[in-house]
Swiss-Prot record:
SUPFAM superfamilies: Ribosomal protein L13
Pfam families assigned to the protein according to its UniProt record, in alphabetical order: Ribosomal_L13
Subunit structure and binding partners: Part of the 50S ribosomal subunit.
Organism: Histophilus somni (strain 2336)
Highest taxon, organism lineage: Bacteria
Protein name: Large ribosomal subunit protein uL13
GO cellular component terms, A-Z: cytosolic large ribosomal subunit
């Protein structure tokens, strides 16, 4: 018996919409990363992008447990000397709520060209409106 290897041109990708309201950030991100990689499919192949497209709505309503709302810090560098910046989870949600989910999911995907291709299939929106109705996404309950 031969091992099945998925070919990029034969992979069937579905569109799903996920409502992040009240969902715990880490648990949501782990499941999104799993589905973006395609590990939920029987035809999963590690070196082929077999994952689905995922649209996340209501990113501003994602939850964290404990004191992480004030204690969790996000860091970035501007590129200038002494340009290290930081923001708490609460500040990030106020400034750019999509980034919170994007950063969490991106850290759970492979690093390299394949991981970047998987990450491009994730669409995150702060509110309940999205512009992917033409793809007829199915509701995914996580």
């Amino acid at each position: 018996m031969k091992t099945f290897v998925a070919k990029p041109e034969t992979v069937k990708r579905d569109w799903y919409v996920v409502d992040a309201t009240g969902k715990t950030l880490g648990r949501l991100a782990a499941e999104l990363a799993r589905r973006l990689r395609g590990k939920h499919k029987a035809e999963y192949t590690p070196h082929v992008d077999t994952g689905d497209y995922i649209v996340v709505i209501n990113a501003e309503k994602v939850a964290v447990t404990g004191n992480k709302e004030t204690d969790k810090l996000y860091y970035w560098h501007t590129g200038y000397v002494g340009g290290i910046k930081q923001a708490t989870f609460k500040e990030m949600i106020a400034r750019r709520p999509e980034a919170v989910i994007e950063i969490a999911v991106k850290g759970m995907l492979p690093k390299g060209p394949l991981g970047r291709a998987m990450f491009r299939k994730l669409k995150v929106y702060a509110g309940s409106e999205h512009n992917h109705a033409a793809q007829q996404p199915q509701v995914l309950d996580i």
